[in-house]
Amino acid sequence: MLSRRDALKLTAAALMVPKAQPRTTRKVIVAGAGIGGLSCAWQLVRRGHEVVVLEASERTGGHVFTFRDPLDDGLYADAGAEHFTQPGYERYWSYVNEFKLPHRYYPRRDHILRFIGGKMYSPEMLADPKVLEGFGLNRREVEYLKTHPWPELASLYYAPYVDSFRDEYRPFDAGLNHLDQLSTIDLFRKDGASAGALAFIGGSGSALQSVWHAAILKLRGVPLFPPHVYRLVGGNQKLPDAFVERLGSRIRLRSPVTRIEHGQTGVRVTCRSDGGSVTHEADHLVCAMSAVMLRAIPVTPAWPADKAYALQHVPYYFDSRVIFQSRTQFWKRDGISPSMEFGDRELNHVWTTCDEVETARGLIVGTATGLVTPEAALAVYRKRYPGASEDVEKAHVVAWASNPWASACETTSYRPGELVKLWPALIEPHGRIHFVGAYADNLNWGMEAATRSGYRASEAIDKT
């Protein structure tokens, strides 16, 4: 995280950015300094465009935030975006390589212990036919899980549909539009899923959306639940900070947008600042804030009906990051995997991080649904952890739902019938206004969607 003072110190370095010759130099306002807005701004600057980035809060990075204080011994936790995959995240990886950011394999998905019906199951147990039959899975499902990991069960029912998608941005060309009227659980039930399986897979969202997302992953060569994930050494905020270092004083912190005006020849954006109200004029605007924040900003002329509906109705989830610092790495002493799924709202799942930090202490991080207290999350952990050596000494929660500028996390499933209303209206530019962020791409994986949409917007502006 870079403060305003730090950003201003980098002005001289920012002026040395190597620039490509654009077709026509454009003035661009980027509203939002999360990873999507920052990556878009960097792409525009390196193409020679004139850019100002307006950030409402006191820090850059948005949901990419590395938590350090008051942890001890140099420990840190990614309190927002937690990992990236390979394959997948191609645009994100391009920046990691460009800036030569150290990264490491993240074993958080190795040997996950899952609590089902109050009992702990290992990956080996969840491949045992007797265990699976005890859940009420049918013969076909049991056979499938003999050769596929437990989190891939839904792939059995996606398989008949995913090859119908040729262009990952054109879901309605697959000839499966009728699936938007079904929920995923109804589709799986129709296709023979057992009641036992439907306790674990499916859902109430649009079947077309979920099938499409599975198809996108297959086109990218990514499993439904990627087991191999990575993180940046020192915290995933290293990438937003690298953008900030290069953008320098183009970034204006504590500058929340209060009004957007647009026309055929340009845009006018009004924001608050330390000195009152400031208006910026430009050729283009990149809206790189969440749709939740964008809904609250007056726009003149108003959004067209399809864009207004999409921005108003795109659904989000709101999670909290739970962080436990322990006196020792007690799970090693107990011989127990630190990666666990509990399924409780107060603590859904946990894993360990910071294995490269030289300390006897341990760090367990996890996710809770909505707002939760450290005490409630720790109570769940102590209830579920099966070993005898647990010695958590500090518990913290980063509650995104209470953040005034970055409350919304990633988008979640659309209701049946909504995909045709939200796509592609949600991501399409409107005149000289472009849309960037975790909600503004075809797959809702935060840092991947943000960097992909940021690149797409920069390309569109550069080609005008």
Predicted regions located by residue number:
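N-terminal secretory signal peptides and thylakoid transit peptides that target proteins
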Residues: 1-14
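N-terminal Rossmann-like FAD-binding beta1-loop-alpha1 element of flavoenzymes
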Residues: 28-53
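Glycine-rich FAD pyrophosphate-binding loop
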Residues: 46-67
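Conserved flavin/dinucleotide-binding core of flavoenzymes
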Residues: 47, 124-125, 266, 272, ...
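Dinucleotide-binding Rossmann-like beta1-alpha1 core, especially the glycine-rich loop
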Residues: 72-147
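Core beta-strand elements of the Rossmann-like FAD/NAD(P) dinucleotide-binding domain
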Residues: 276-284
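Flavin (primarily FAD) binding-site architecture
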Residues: 287-303
